[in-house]
A protein has these predicted regions:
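Substrate-binding cleft of secreted/luminal carbohydrate-active enzymes
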Residues: 88, 259-267, 286-358
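Boundary/entry segment of secreted carbohydrate-active catalytic domains
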Residues: 35-94, 230, 236
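Single conserved hydrophobic/aromatic residue that forms the stacking wall/gate
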Residues: 1-12
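Active-site clefts of carbohydrate-active enzymes
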Residues: 52-62, 141, 209-229, 262, ...
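Aromatic- and acid-rich polysaccharide-binding/catalytic face
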Residues: 172-185, 214-215, 228-269
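Active-site groove signature of glycoside hydrolases
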Residues: 138-144, 159-190, 257-261, 327
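An active-site-proximal structural segment forming one wall of the substrate-binding cleft
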Residues: 113-129, 148-175, 200, 240-251, ...
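Aromatic-lined substrate-binding rim segments of carbohydrate-active enzymes
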Residues: 70-141, 190-211, 270-280
Length: 358
């Protein structure tokens, strides 16, 4: 041990000398630079659940567009692949009048013609990079206006058949369905809507998997358009379990996985809610995924890439709970090296450092 200490001291003195010769600020800085973990992580690496899926947020409620073409999307899929992403999910195929593909049905309903067939683009790129693409259903906006989810069944019963015939039969990368309606509590029409849509998706595609991604009605579940970051009335763990026990009971035969959004509860609440989510999923034979939000809900600016430690803590909680898969909302804006947000690329670097990805 003594020899090791002497050797370390000699090494430090050499660094001090080098620092002074090249304009260093002195002994204290050089000693700090030689300390274990300097410039790197001081927490154990790789103890979180790796992100293996991401949403593709091209028809968005509240995230600015990056106006990418095929070249940029191709590069982004390559970045995704480099960290182990094998699943990409179209967040929704349309929102109100904006749509991702030239849908004969939706165009007749007054939707706008898109300049690019993004659905075809995403399916081709998913195939190129060995990924599976999950198709996100159409969102008419009527649920957000009325609070009743049942309106979405009428539109999507045509969209599901149309998309399967136009794309599902053509591309092997078409791997599943995302039932894009978002809820947090027992919601009018939710069980019937999820069941009807999930059943149809499975019937037309020969049983391809389906999933949902609800939010937890925690303290951070506030309107994105408002100025508040938190609210006083938040769901308890017990009430969350009661309501989702009822919902899972009504949908588990046609919904294969549930990826709860993880950003609406505080970091010291993660373990309690995650344990409930996993227990309920196991009870009903569903997969328990986490939707690890890579944007920061704690900031007054909506929305910017998340602080790395916050993402790390959420992924570590998912690992402790025994979750089956981690997906994120979403890579292209908040983790990509080519994002419009400079700090997204830094998050990408910290993520790779934590998981020892070269």
């Amino acid at each position: 041990i003594l020899i090791g200490l002497v050797g370390s001291e000699m090494c430090i003195r050499d660094r001090v000398k080098a620092a002074s010769e090249f304009g260093g600020t002195g002994t204290d800085d050089a000693l700090a630079a030689s300390a274990p973990g300097y410039g790197g992580l001081i927490v154990p690496k790789g103890e979180g659940l790796r992100i293996t899926g991401t949403f593709l947020d091209e028809i968005s409620h509240d995230i600015p567009h990056q106006n990418w073409g095929e070249k940029e999307w191709d590069a982004d899929f390559r970045h995704m692949k480099s960290i182990g992403i094998d699943t990409v999910i179209g967040i929704r195929s349309g929102y109100r009048k904006f749509i991702t593909y030239p849908s004969p049905y939706l165009l007749k309903k007054g939707c706008y013609m898109p300049s690019v067939d993004l659905l075809d683009l995403f399916l081709r790129l998913a195939g190129k990079y060995g990924m599976k693409f999950y198709f996100g259903l159409y969102d008419s906006g009527e649920y957000w206006d009325t609070g009743d989810m049942s309106h979405e069944v009428e539109h999507n019963k045509y969209v599901i058949d149309e998309v399967w015939n136009m794309y599902g039969r053509k591309y092997e990368s078409f791997g599943g369905w995302y039932l894009s309606g978002e809820i947090s509590r027992a919601t009018k029409g939710a069980i019937g809507t999820f069941h009807a849509l999930g059943k149809q998706c499975k019937e037309v595609s020969g049983g391809l998997p389906t999933f949902i991604s609800p939010w937890i009605d925690g303290k951070k579940a506030v309107m994105a358009s408002g100025s508040k970051l938190t609210k006083e009335q938040a769901v308890s763990v017990e009430q969350h379990e009661r309501e989702w026990d009822e919902i899972f009971d009504g949908i588990h035969d046609v919904v294969d996985a549930c990826a709860f959004q993880d950003g609406h509860i505080d970091y010291d609440e993660l373990d309690a809610f995650f344990a409930v989510n996993k227990r309920l999923a196991d009870k009903y034979g569903m997969q328990c995924w986490t939707n690890a939000e890579s944007f920061d809900r704690d900031m007054p600016i909506k929305f910017l890439p998340i602080k790395f430690d916050k993402l790390r803590m959420k992924l570590e909680a998912a690992m402790r709970a025994g979750y089956d898969k981690a997906i994120t909302f979403e890579f292209s804006h908040f983790m990509s090296p080519q994002s419009a947000y400079l700090q997204a690329g830094h998050l990408f670097d910290r993520y790779k450092e934590y998981f020892n990805i070269r």
